[in-house]
């Protein structure tokens, strides 16, 4: 047996960041078994240290000349590195905001962190999976861990209800997605690698067959569930309202990023022959998500439900970059997910702090908060205004890049719809900000009138403060200093070969569509000679 050949085919060094997360997960469980409840004081910091070590390992893998591992099952290219970094960073910030919250709920912190690390592991593997079996295993690891996290506070009936709904709808979407990829397997002649699937379908000459279209629709249904796109969003409001707040913070960023990573890799690699069809479907999803998410958010009275519908709308904005299919489109998509990480987690950190001190998440109860807790008011205001796209915050530049990429790609009416729905979203974000900064004492809510003294020295509150300050600074400065982040996003696209091939073929197809129009214009104009004769 040639072990050197086997080692070169496995290329296990590519998944070193995931290996570090696995070791961190095992370390958390072992330390908890040995020390018991006394480990809760610092076990969260152990997990955060492991996640940041994983991010450092990702940094050193940038522009890896040999990113393929597990005989083609995993691709550690620069695109996957960015998405894996987003997921790991979102998990680290989630742990910061979870320590006090989980302790107050009376549930073990070590088990919570272990399940969260499992979800992180699934999301990181999903970001680079380039083979059907790897995709399914990674997707299930992320999904099952998410179900467990959603129902982690067993004493809360709302958490149990949210977990059951999430499980039932998630299992159904997984079954639909699995049926779609099984059709791909059959149409390609038994191939499981995404690139081999495309070649197999082209060889079998079934590029426009009904079976391939059905496979595409079912695959998009599974992806739509993961990114909370309408009309696959039914689980989102109930799960966001009932699940523990740190869990939905991770789902809104880490799980969504993994879903978009899967969408890019699966659709561009396995479905190149029906590229126009999947772009049309995603255009419909983007329109529905932007309209439904922003309009329904206007009527919400719960802060978490409002952010649930906001998350649906944000998915619609990100899809503009995917539909554009250009270098600028994919780069703006990744840039927006990077800044969305900071502004969304900043908002959820503030919601956790408010709920810990008042026991409610009703929007009306935030009235007059500025007079009792200026830092929390500032953090939540910056996060909401950034989500709305107010300059000069990070969300403004994220939306500008997305809309510019869409306009350059000819998606004029989709960009105009995005602008209109952005204006709608600004209304319900500013409504909350205005409510928090009222000055009249009689306008204060009962929760704010009875607001406890702000103390950061209580157990578990210092990590929350650190998480709030870090995400607040990042949200405030990521827009003004956006060039490094956009360069990172742009380089991740430029250094990913399969995506460059997809972009070039899309540009060539667009040019071929423009040629007849240019010919007709040139034929309609009189030549110089004929004009001279006249």
Swiss-Prot record:
It catalyses: a plastoquinone + NADH + (n+1) H(+)(in) = a plastoquinol + NAD(+) + n H(+)(out); a plastoquinone + NADPH + (n+1) H(+)(in) = a plastoquinol + NADP(+) + n H(+)(out). GO terms for molecular function: NADH dehydrogenase (ubiquinone) activity; quinone binding. The chain crosses the membrane at residues 15-35, 42-62, 79-99, 109-129, 132-152, 167-187, 210-230, 244-264, 280-300, 306-326, 334-354, 378-398, 410-432, 466-486. It is found in: Cellular thylakoid membrane. It comes from the Bacteria. It is a multi-pass membrane protein. Keywords: Membrane, NAD, NADP, Plastoquinone, Quinone, Thylakoid, Translocase, Transmembrane, Transmembrane helix, Transport. The keyword rRNA-binding does not apply. Its EC number is 7.1.1.-. GO terms for biological process: ATP synthesis coupled electron transport; photosynthesis, light reaction. GO terms for cellular component: plasma membrane-derived thylakoid membrane. NDH-1 can be composed of about 15 different subunits; different subcomplexes with different compositions have been identified which probably have different functions. Belongs to the complex I subunit 2 family. NCBIfam families: NDH_I_N (TIGR01770), PRK02504.1 (NF002701). HAMAP family: NDH1_NuoN_1. NDH-1 shuttles electrons from an unknown electron donor, via FMN and iron-sulfur (Fe-S) centers, to quinones in the respiratory and/or the photosynthetic chain. The immediate electron acceptor for the enzyme in this species is believed to be plastoquinone. Couples the redox reaction to proton translocation, and thus conserves the redox energy in a proton gradient. Cyanobacterial NDH-1 also plays a role in inorganic carbon-concentration. This is NAD(P)H-quinone oxidoreductase subunit 2. The gene is ndhB.
């Amino acid at each position: 047996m040639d072990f050197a050949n086997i080692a070169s085919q496995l290329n296990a060094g590519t998944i070193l960041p995931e290996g570090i997360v696995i070791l961190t997960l095992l370390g958390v469980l072992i330390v908890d078994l040995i020390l018991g409840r006394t480990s809760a004081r610092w076990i969260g910091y152990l997990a955060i240290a492991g996640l940041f070590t994983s991010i450092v390992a990702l940094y050193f893998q940038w522009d890896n000349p040999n990113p393929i591992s597990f005989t083609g099952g995993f691709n550690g290219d620069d695109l996957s590195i960015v998405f894996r970094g987003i997921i790991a960073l979102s998990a680290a910030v989630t742990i910061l905001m979870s320590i006090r919250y989980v302790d107050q709920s009376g549930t073990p912190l070590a088990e919570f962190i272990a399940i969260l690390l499992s979800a992180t592991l699934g999301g990181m593997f999903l970001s680079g999976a380039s083979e059907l079996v790897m995709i399914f295993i990674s997707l299930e690891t992320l999904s099952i861990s998410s179900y467990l996290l959603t129902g982690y506070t067993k004493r809360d009936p709302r958490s149990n209800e949210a977990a059951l709904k999430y499980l039932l709808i998630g299992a159904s979407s997984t079954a639909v997605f699995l049926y779609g990829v099984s059709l791909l397997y059959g149409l390609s002649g038994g191939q499981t690698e995404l690139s081999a699937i495309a070649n197999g379908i082209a060889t079998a000459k079934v590029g426009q067959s009904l079976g391939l279209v059905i496979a595409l629709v079912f695959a998009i249904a599974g992806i739509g569930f993961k990114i909370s796109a309408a009309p696959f969003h039914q689980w989102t409001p109930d799960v966001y309202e009932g699940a523990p707040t740190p869990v939905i913070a991770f789902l809104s960023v880490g799980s969504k990023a993994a879903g978009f990573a899967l969408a890019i890799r699966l659709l561009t690699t396995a479905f190149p022959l029906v590229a126009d069809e999947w772009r049309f479907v995603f255009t419909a999803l983007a329109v529905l998500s932007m309209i439904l998410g922003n309009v329904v958010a206007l009527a919400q009275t719960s802060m978490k439900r409002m952010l649930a519908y906001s998350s649906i709308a944000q998915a619609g904005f990100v899809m503009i970059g995917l539909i554009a299919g250009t270098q600028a489109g994919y780069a703006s998509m990744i840039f927006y997910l990077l800044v969305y990480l900071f502004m969304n987690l900043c908002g959820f950190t503030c919601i956790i702090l408010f709920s810990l001190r008042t026991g409610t998440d009703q929007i009306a109860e935030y009235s007059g908060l500025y007079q009792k807790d200026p830092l929390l008011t500032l953090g939540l205001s910056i996060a909401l205004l950034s989500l709305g796209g107010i300059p000069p915050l990070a969300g403004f530049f994220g939306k500008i890049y997305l809309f510019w990429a869409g306009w350059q790609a000819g998606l004029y009416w989709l960009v105009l719809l995005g602008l209109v729905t952005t204006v709608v979203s600004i209304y319900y974000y500013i409504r909350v900000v205005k409510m928090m900064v009222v000055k009249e004492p009689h306008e204060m809510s009962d929760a704010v009138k009875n607001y406890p003294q702000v103390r950061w020295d209580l157990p578990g509150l210092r990590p929350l403060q650190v998480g709030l300050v870090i995400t607040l600074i990042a949200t405030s400065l990521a827009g003004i200093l956006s060039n490094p982040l956009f360069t990172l996003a742009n380089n991740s696209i430029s250094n990913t070969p399969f995506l460059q091939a997809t972009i070039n073929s899309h540009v060539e197809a667009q040019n071929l569509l423009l040629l007849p129009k240019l010919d007709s214009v040139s034929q309609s104009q009189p030549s110089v000679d004929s004009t001279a004769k006249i």
